[in-house]
Amino acid sequence: MTQEKKAEDPDRGMDTTSAAPRLWSTHCDGEVLLRLSKHGPGHETPMTIPELFQESVERFGAYPALASKNGKKWDTLTFSQYYDVCRKAARSLIKLGLQRFHGVGILGFNSVEWVVAALGAILAGGLCVGIYATNSAEACQYVIKQANVNVLIVENDQQLQKILSIPPDKMETVKAIVQYRLPLMENSTNLYSWQDFMELGNAIPNIQLDRVILSQKANQCAVIIYTSGTTGSPKGVMLSHDNITWTAGAMAREIELIHVSGKQDTIVSYLPLSHIAAQLMDIWIPIKVGVLTFFAQPDALRGTLVYTLQEVKPTYFLGVPRVWEKMQDTIKENVAKSSNLRKKAFAWAKMLGLKVNTKKMLGKRDIPMNYRMAKALVFTKVRTSLGLDNCHTFFSGASPLSQDVSEFFLSLDIPIGEIYGMTECSGPHTVSCKSIYRVLSCGKVLNGCKNMLYKQNKDGVGEVCMWGRHVFMGYLGKEDATLEVLDEDGWLHSGDIGRLDSHDFLYITGRIKEVLITAGGENIWPIPIETLVKEKIPIISHAMLVGDKAKFLSMLLTLKCETDQMSGEPLDKLNLEAISFCQMLGSQAVTVSDILKIRDPVVYTAIQYGIDIVNQQAVSDSHRIRKWIILEKDFSIQGGELGPTSKLKRDLITQKYKAQIDNMYSS
């Protein structure tokens, strides 16, 4: 029986014979059965990442591929140069003793060197292993050991010192460390600058590298992505060559990224490449369809992203909800400072924009004459101010986008399509874009993939399960964890609860692991309640519902604050929107401390008023928020409360603020 015939039917069950590959493996050198369809999408010929790269060079060789800022100018590499420099890096990695299916750990902000190290690792027969720049030394050590990392590529001395603080006996697999930015401050054997590292491979003949490349198979592991560990310890998600190459092609088709001679799409890389969403959008799709990737500055998320966007003017853009929320805040602050006439024009244009774009979303194309005026007066100016004036496709991913933010941008002629998925399905499972769009929906299933709602209730709500060539190989070294998410028929269980409408649009309603079960046995999904609180109370930055096994629900709140431009840490000072909110109420507060010190009565009353509105919409008494507390500091990645894509780390927050939570239930 061929692999195709075995894998085409998701109801067939696992292949349990030892002679043939199974649908899953937990070994880094394992091979899996590819889930090819009989025909159509999902039936494409499997290819390795080196084969994809070679095809890209043949098609786009002279086009620019990567661009990085050097002073005031951008240095670029063409696709041909990109491939050559990756081969050079691969030979250097072989020279350093990189073993087959062992990791190359990359620790630092997005850069040309990050991507070259990733591709170099794969060409050399190793595994690309991204390590979050915000990881502690202990977290780095866990990844190094688990992924058998042979070579570490670090950004700067700060990251180097983090690695050097790990006892050598905890890094026995590491043979060399390379620093790719800033001069080396240390001098020891097996420690190299990027320039010296790139010359090491000159002694390795090209034919030796070619043999390694030719020996690779599409059903073998190429990339390990570590889950950010919002619950429990991180797991190494093994993605095969086919996972990457097929998903990149399927996603590019879905979002209509097609290379046209003489035109080139562009993207700005700023979300951590250790995360699958950024890696797919910034590395793999660009190789597949010839996109030019610009690298933002390391402080992009601390305020400089907008300047890069204004300079580069990308044609498609992916933001996590927190990025879109920050953009929304900026627009609101600018409008608040404008004249009354401009405020009226903005409000009029928004009202018209929401009406027209909602109709467009439903397939109606009748555009009123005054829409052009709204576009000229408001929409074009907003896009230009954000650096998105050349952008044809806008996305949000990693966590749900609120209705408030989605409709705000829709009203400004910026329809944000949501991408739903997980690391374990190579990133996307459903996609919502300008041609497949509904507010609050995650769109439709990626062409060539299958969706199932497991254990549906009477309302058609069940656990989202996935099947297709995007489904991962398994968790590295964790068979029990792998079999928890892959059932006996090979379906990937997401842990997310969702429903499909009559047009097959998927809506996610909650996450099984995040559900709060009250003392009375009620199941409460926190995200809809938290989202509503943030919508109704403009001063709130983060809201986290608590009350598992408790008699009633309580909530932790943080206020919108300025952030330190250097560290990214939230400051005590309120941001402009929060200060305007206070002034509107008659409060003189300009810091969080000002509000907490005197339990500012007008601010507390306004927050309680917003909570009351949320409670009025509760489906039952058990869904109402009884108590709440304002924390002294906003949540942040640096503070540990948020993951790398700004998701709430609920377990950690619950532990960190245990005293405050206990106090709400004891008082």
Curated annotation (Swiss-Prot):
<keyword id="KW-0436">Ligase</keyword>
<dbReference type="GO" id="GO:0030154">
    <property type="term" value="P:cell differentiation"/>
</dbReference>
<dbReference type="InterPro" id="IPR000873">
    <property type="entry name" value="AMP-dep_synth/lig_dom"/>
</dbReference>
<keyword id="KW-0963">Cytoplasm</keyword>
<dbReference type="GO" id="GO:0005737">
    <property type="term" value="C:cytoplasm"/>
</dbReference>
<feature type="region of interest" description="Disordered">
    <location>
        <begin position="1"/>
        <end position="20"/>
    </location>
</feature>
<dbReference type="Pfam" id="PF00501">
    <property type="entry name" value="AMP-binding"/>
</dbReference>
<dbReference type="GO" id="GO:0016020">
    <property type="term" value="C:membrane"/>
</dbReference>
<dbReference type="GO" id="GO:0007283">
    <property type="term" value="P:spermatogenesis"/>
</dbReference>
<keyword id="KW-0744">Spermatogenesis</keyword>
<dbReference type="InterPro" id="IPR042099">
    <property type="entry name" value="ANL_N_sf"/>
</dbReference>
<dbReference type="GO" id="GO:0005524">
    <property type="term" value="F:ATP binding"/>
</dbReference>
<dbReference type="GO" id="GO:0047617">
    <property type="term" value="F:fatty acyl-CoA hydrolase activity"/>
</dbReference>
<comment type="similarity">
    <text>Belongs to the ATP-dependent AMP-binding enzyme family. Bubblegum subfamily.</text>
</comment>
<feature type="binding site">
    <location>
        <position position="511"/>
    </location>
    <ligand>
        <name>ATP</name>
    </ligand>
</feature>
<feature type="binding site">
    <location>
        <begin position="418"/>
        <end position="423"/>
    </location>
    <ligand>
        <name>ATP</name>
    </ligand>
</feature>
<protein>
    <recommendedName>
        <fullName>Long-chain-fatty-acid--CoA ligase ACSBG2</fullName>
        <ecNumber>6.2.1.3</ecNumber>
        <ecNumber>6.2.1.15</ecNumber>
    </recommendedName>
</protein>
<feature type="binding site">
    <location>
        <begin position="227"/>
        <end position="235"/>
    </location>
    <ligand>
        <name>ATP</name>
    </ligand>
</feature>
<dbReference type="GO" id="GO:0005739">
    <property type="term" value="C:mitochondrion"/>
</dbReference>
<keyword id="KW-0276">Fatty acid metabolism</keyword>
<keyword id="KW-0443">Lipid metabolism</keyword>
<keyword id="KW-0472">Membrane</keyword>
<dbReference type="InterPro" id="IPR020845">
    <property type="entry name" value="AMP-binding_CS"/>
</dbReference>
<dbReference type="Pfam" id="PF23562">
    <property type="entry name" value="AMP-binding_C_3"/>
</dbReference>
<feature type="binding site">
    <location>
        <position position="624"/>
    </location>
    <ligand>
        <name>ATP</name>
    </ligand>
</feature>
<dbReference type="GO" id="GO:0005829">
    <property type="term" value="C:cytosol"/>
</dbReference>
<dbReference type="GO" id="GO:0042759">
    <property type="term" value="P:long-chain fatty acid biosynthetic process"/>
</dbReference>
<dbReference type="GO" id="GO:0006631">
    <property type="term" value="P:fatty acid metabolic process"/>
</dbReference>
<dbReference type="GO" id="GO:0004467">
    <property type="term" value="F:long-chain fatty acid-CoA ligase activity"/>
</dbReference>
<dbReference type="GO" id="GO:0047676">
    <property type="term" value="F:arachidonate-CoA ligase activity"/>
</dbReference>
<keyword id="KW-0067">ATP-binding</keyword>
<comment type="function">
    <text>Catalyzes the conversion of fatty acids such as long chain and very long-chain fatty acids to their active form acyl-CoAs for both synthesis of cellular lipids, and degradation via beta-oxidation. Can activate diverse saturated, monosaturated and polyunsaturated fatty acids. Has increased ability to activate oleic and linoleic acid. May play a role in spermatogenesis.</text>
</comment>
<keyword id="KW-0221">Differentiation</keyword>
<feature type="binding site">
    <location>
        <position position="496"/>
    </location>
    <ligand>
        <name>ATP</name>
    </ligand>
</feature>
<keyword id="KW-0217">Developmental protein</keyword>
<keyword id="KW-0547">Nucleotide-binding</keyword>
<feature type="compositionally biased region" description="Basic and acidic residues">
    <location>
        <begin position="1"/>
        <end position="14"/>
    </location>
</feature>
